[in-house]
A protein has these predicted regions:
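A conserved ligand/cofactor-binding region detector
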Residues: 1-806
Length: 806
């Protein structure tokens, strides 16, 4: 069926009548949003059936992308855009008596992720579908998301994010495809005719019910699926306890099961939290791999060719338990011998590493495995024993055996399990992959050098330019001769020929001004804040973590504020600093830094001296839909992590493709951006990764503090506090003393002077509007390499070995 404005109107009206028992005149905005979603869902579902039939008939190899996060954002506009129905849907909504903008605004962000890891997974799903790779994403259907951030008296407060109230319109429950996951119990083994028979008994059963979200690609009828698992108890209530009046106890089993799929990243600084997180991870991978194996056997009647027809890509260490779980299924359920099963596992599982931070390389207490996952624990012990033997045979060095051990000192090291059980291990930027090869995983890399690869991250440029920045999209189409860049992003290179064209640069400037005004209107409506649109929009939005160094930005703003106090006639362009970040609920220091940003904002914004000159704003509840408004309006992109700590970053790419200029360190993908742009098109500063490592052994922040009066004055403001009466001596101590770990672990003070200089260079350049806009256009023109389509093609060529649409 061909869809246009009229057929969409008919379909929407029918959905309203059949699902909500109302006409278009009676429907609420929420009902209208859900009806529109259901219409698009039906179109995608139909195409999805056809896609899966083609994949089955042609016996294509499938890619299964496992990630604990998928930060999807809103889907109504995205799906309409990919289905090339956005214009028709806008008109249909308007003609039914609604405002299309209001309907799109009704949709909540899907609460399935937190940061860059989840947004990357969402971008990759879009690209896999656009490139017509048979693929599926898998995750948990978090009913309350990560959390909704509220700022109360300057501090973060976490509220439940009940996104499914409206967001469930995209989900298709598949009760008939539910899987059963087992926790606890005991394991007995016996030999029978040379075969090891395993009996797992007295376990707790949890049902994993799949809810499928269809994923449409651009310029294709190919549709892939994101399968989200909901945890349910097979026994909704204990009737015996209920009839005795023990109502809470009667529903206890149900509540324990429900908890598994309620919240992303439950706090784990206590035993119960660790237990719940491990349950989440096992629940997710067990349901996923059972489902994949079941479908494979239905098609082929054997598991012997499983690795030839399936790739299991694990996004960070969270899904690592898929390795022992697939072994369990192959050995226990399919009756394979160990070596044959291990051959299959190590020829279909691939691991993407996303961090070099020690605390993020998951290590689980052995005791949890013994209690919660007794059979998986047995398999893990055997994997660990054989891997240890392999390391021993290669190195004959007890120190290296200890370093590479999977089980060591009462802990289970997930990254080492990934290395042992995967066919490929990749980093996500050239610098990051080099650190993996030469430092973090150096010993494993020497054993198996061909296993280690690099695939630099990429972004869904169709969403992050064409969909969210129509003014820039229109300019690109005019200058490159059409919409070819949407499927061939390297066509953006054609923009370079206009870098000296003042009329083009003036148009680019006008587009940025319009986007700044649109964001200012949004910020006023959402948060009641009035932004100065004549100021530089200087933006740092990302997860709040000390290594991302929001604190460095704060100190630089304090320094700038102090300069204005010393010299009220100081001639600098007006600057608006925009922050957006969520801190993990248990990360006390990160939450204090959010409080600090808000204390500084209160001080600066209430000072008459700063009016129309300096402004600081913390944007509440940073999320994809907020980023979609902010990125097109941003002029300066702060990418200032300690060199060697950020694996890649993708925010840097989104800013770049929208024409913001980067103030940054040579870290993550900034390195590759610098190779493309040179010093002349970004504002680099600070220590390099090797210099950070070299300095670490002798670094003394106290020395810098004593020698540099400008730095000392800025840092001491943390002790003296702000007009709200709040002081931050704890953060001061963290920078200058080693009472809680190494002083200034992320070298904020070491890079302070260089950072202030980079900001000064940026301000000076900003005043030359032609030069600034030429740099901006150059950034856009050279950003095509950071498209997710390029990254997925690289995965397909070098790791997955699957064909794709060229």
């Amino acid at each position: 069926m061909t869809y246009n404005k009229e057929t969409l109107k008919e379909a929407i009206v029918q959905k309203l009548r059949l699902n909500y028992g109302c006409t278009e005149k009676q429907a609420t905005d929420g009902e209208m949003m859900k009806a529109c979603a259901m219409v698009l869902r039906d179109i995608m579902a139909e195409r999805g059936v056809q896609t899966r039939e083609n994949t089955t008939r042609e016996e294509k190899r499938k890619v299964h992308y496992l990630s604990l996060e998928f930060l999807m954002g809103r889907s109504l506009m995205k799906n309409a855009f990919n289905l090339e129905l956005l214009g028709a849907l806008n008109e249909a909504i308007d003609e039914l008596g609604f405002k299309a903008a209001d309907i799109f605004e009704m949709e909540p962000d899907a609460g399935l992720g937190n940061g860059g890891l989840g947004r990357l997974a969402a971008c990759y799903l879009d690209s896999m579908t656009t490139l017509e790779i048979p693929a599926a994403g898998y995750s948990i259907c978090y009913e309350l998301g990560i959390f909704k951030q509220k700022i109360v008296e300057g501090q973060q407060v976490e509220l439940p994010d009940d996104w499914m109230q409206l967001g469930d319109a995209w989900l298709l429950p598949k009760l008939q495809e539910a899987e059963e996951v087992h926790f606890g119990g005991t394991v007995r083994t016996r030999w029978d005719n040379g075969h090891l028979m395993v009996v797992h008994e007295d376990y707790t059963r949890v049902l994993a019910v799949p809810c499928d979200m269809e994923i449409a690609g651009y310029d294709t009828d190919h549709v892939n699926t994101l399968r989200l698992w909901q945890a349910r108890s097979p026994k909704p209530i204990d009737m015996k306890l209920f009839s005795q009046g023990q109502y809470l106890h009667a529903a206890e089993e149900r509540a324990m099961a429900d908890a598994i799929s309620q919240v992303l990243y439950p706090e784990d600084n206590h035993y119960e939290g660790k237990s719940l997180r491990l349950k989440q991870q096992y629940f997710f991978v067990s349901a996923t791999i059972q489902s994949i194996v079941r479908k494979h056997i239905q098609q082929y009647g054997t598991v012997k060719n499983f690795h030839e027809k399936n790739v299991i890509q694990i996004n960070d260490t969270h899904p690592t338990l898929v390795i022992p779980e697939l072994m369990r299924i192959l050995v226990d359920d399919a009756g394979m011998d160990w070596d044959a099963a291990w051959h299959i596992v190590t020829h279909c599982v691939a691991y993407t590493n996303h961090t070099v931070m020690a605390e993020a390389l998951e290590v689980w207490p052995q005791q949890l495995f013994e209690t919660l996952l007794p059979r998986v624990w047995q398999i893990l012990q055997e994997i660990a024993r054989r891997w240890q033997q392999q390391v021993d045979d290669f190195y004959h060095d007890p120190a290296k055996t200890a370093k590479l051990a999977i089980i060591w000192d009462g802990g289970v090291r997930m990254a080492n399990l990934c290395i042992a059980g995967s066919m490929a291990v990749n980093g996500v930027s050239a610098l990051h992959s080099e650190i993996l090869r030469k430092d973090l995983f150096k010993d494993a890399c020497q054993m198996q050098p061909d296993k280690f690869k690099n695939v630099t991250n990429g972004i869904d440029h169709r969403r992050w330019v064409s969909q969210i920045n129509p003014g820039l999209d229109s300019l690109i189409r005019d200058l490159t001769g059409g919409d070819g860049y949407l499927t061939h992003p390297m066509e953006l290179k054609k923009l370079e020929q206009y870098v000296g064209d003042t009329s083009v640069l003036a148009r680019l400037d006008d587009i940025k001004k319009a986007n700044k005004q649109a964001f200012a209107d949004f910020a006023k409506k959402q948060q009641g804040v009035v932004l100065n649109t004549d100021a530089i929009f200087d933006v740092q939005v990302k997860r709040l973590h000390e290594y991302k160094r929001q604190l460095l930005n704060v100190l630089q703003i304090i320094y700038l504020y102090q300069r204005l106090q010393d010299d009220p006639d100081l001639s600098i362009p007006p600057q608006t600093f925009l922050f957006g970040a969520k801190a993990a609920p248990g990360y006390a220091v990160a939450k204090r830094i959010i409080h600090l940003i808000n204390s500084l904002a209160d001080q600066v914004n209430s000072d008459p001296l700063c009016r129309d000159r300096l402004q600081v704003v913390f944007l509440e509840n940073y999320r994809v839909s907020l980023a979609e408004m902010l990125m097109p309006a941003s002029e300066v992109s702060q990418q200032i992590s300690t060199a060697g700590k950020e694996a890649s970053g993708t925010g840097n790419m989104k800013f770049m493709i929208n024409g913001a200029l980067t103030v940054g360190t040579l870290d993550g993908a900034n390195v590759e951006m610098h190779e493309l742009l040179g010093d002349e098109n970004m504002f680099l500063f600070g220590l390099k990764a090797d210099e950070v490592e070299h300095l670490r052994h002798t670094y003394d922040p106290q020395l810098l503090y004593q020698r540099d009066p400008v730095l000392r004055r800025a840092v001491d403001t943390l002790k003296t506090g702000f007009r709200d009466g709040v002081t931050y001596e704890d953060i001061w101590q963290r920078l200058l003393t080693d009472t809680d770990g190494p002083a200034d672990q992320y070298m904020v003070l070491a890079d302070f002077a260089a950072y202030c200089d980079a900001e000064s260079r940026m301000r000076h350049t900003y005043e030359d509007r032609n030069r600034w806009n030429a740099m901006s256009l150059t950034n856009i023109a050279r950003s095509g390499v950071f498209a997710a389509d390029r990254a997925i093609a690289q995965y397909a060529d070098t790791i997955w070995h699957v064909p794709y649409k060229k």
